[in-house]
Amino acid sequence: MSSRGGKKKSTKTSRSAKAGVIFPVGRMLRYIKKGHPKYRIGVGAPVYMAAVLEYLTAEILELAGNAARDNKKGRVTPRHILLAVANDEELNQLLKGVTIASGGVLPNIHPELLAKKRGSKGKLEAIITPPPAKKAKSPSQKKPVAKKTGGKKGARKSKKQGEVSKAASADSTTEGAPTDGFTVLSTKSLFLGQKLQVVQADIASIDSDAVVHPTNADFYIGGEVGSTLEKKGGKEFVEAVLELRKKNGPLEVAGAAVSAGHGLPAKFVIHCNSPVWGADKCEELLEKTVKNCLALADDRKLKSIAFPSIGSGRNGFPKQTAAQLILKAISSYFVSTMSSSIKTVYFVLFDSESIGIYVQEMAKLDAN
C-alpha cells in the first residue's frame, strides 16, 4: 500500500527474467512472428531460442578467450573468434558460410613452400643419416602367396587383411602409414588440418617418420619405451644412442635430441627428458618437452610423429594430468606455428586405462 492508500505500483517482470535467460525473449518472439505470420508460435519457442543463442555465445567467447591466451594477447579480437569457430568441429560446421568482420582468413599453407624461420628449441645431433631404405623386390619376381590363397579360406584371409589396412589408413594424411599390427581407436582433426590419432600398438612397430623416447639426462634406454625400441632396433640402435650421448652431453629437463632410427620402421627417434611429477614447474616443463619434440620434427620436415604417454611411467605423472598437458601443448603448438610440416600425431598406447583417458580427453579438446 502507498501512503495515500492506493495500490503499490508493481514493476513488470520481463519474459527473459521469468525464463532465467539474459537474451531478450520478447524481442525474439516479435522477430519470429514477423517472419512467420501464418504459423502459431508457442510460448516456449522464443525462450528456447534465447537459451540456445546464449549458450552458443558463451561457448564461442570461451574458445575465443582460449585462442587469445594461446597467442599471448590480453584482448579478444575478431581474429580470435574466427580461430575459435574454426577450431571447433561443430561450430565450424554450423557457421561455415558466416563471414566474421575483421577476422581475416584461414590460409591453406603448404609447409614445403615456406622457409623455416624459427630456431630449434632442443639440442640437435650434428649430422644424422636415416637408415637405408629397404630394397624393393623386382617386378619380375613371382609371389607364391597369390597361388596359396586360393579357395574360400584364402579369399576370407585377404579380405580381412584388406579391412585392417583400410581401418589403419582411413584417417591418416601421411605418406607412410603405420603397420598392420595396430588399431586406430580415435581420430581428431585440428583446424589447420593436422590429425591426432589414438593407436593401440607396439611403439617400436609404428611406421611413422619419428617416434618419441622418454628418457633421462643420460639417455637411459631401460624404461618401457626404451626397452621396446632396443629390442626392435638391436645393436645399431644402442650404438646410435651412445653416439648421441657422447656428442650431445647430458640432456637438460624438457630438452630433446634426435638420432637415426636404426633397425626401426621409424626414420628417427626423438629422445626427450621429461620432468618428474611434483618438481618445480613440472606441468609447464612437460608442455615444453612436447613442444620441443614437435619443433625437432618440424626442423627435419617430418610429416608424422608417434608419442607414448610421456611422464606417466617412472616420472609419476597421473595419467589424466599427463594426457591433458600433452594434448594442450600439441594444440597450442599448432595454433602458434602456422608453417608446420607435421600432418599426423599418433598417441601409441597399450593399456586400457591410458587409451580410455586419451580418447576422453581428445573428445573434449576443443572445449578446453
Curated annotation (Swiss-Prot):
The Macro domain extends over: 183-366
Q: What sequence ranges are listed for the domain Histone H2A?
A: 2-117
Gene3D superfamilies noted in UniProt: Histone, subunit A, Leucine Aminopeptidase, subunit E, domain 1
Mainly localized where? Answer: nucleus
- GO molecular function terms here? ADP-D-ribose binding; ADP-D-ribose modification-dependent protein binding; chromatin binding; chromatin DNA binding; double-stranded methylated DNA binding; enzyme binding; nucleosomal DNA binding; promoter-specific chromatin binding
Residues annotated with Phosphothreonine modification: 129
Q: Where is this cross-link: Glycyl lysine isopeptide (Lys-Gly) (interchain with G-Cter in SUMO2)?
A: 123, 166, 188, 319
Phosphoserine occurs at which residues? 169, 172
Which residues are recorded with the post-translational modification N6-methyllysine?
18
Biased segments, Basic residues type: 144-159
Positions where N6-acetyllysine occurs in the chain: 116, 123
Output the Gene Ontology cellular-component terms: Barr body; chromatin; condensed chromosome; nuclear chromosome; nucleolus; nucleoplasm; nucleosome; nucleus
Modification comment: Monoubiquitinated at either Lys-116 or Lys-117. May also be polyubiquitinated. Ubiquitination is mediated by the CUL3/SPOP E3 complex and does not promote proteasomal degradation. Instead, it is required for enrichment in inactive X chromosome chromatin.
Q: What is this protein called?
A: Core histone macro-H2A.1
Q: Which gene encodes it?
A: Macroh2a1
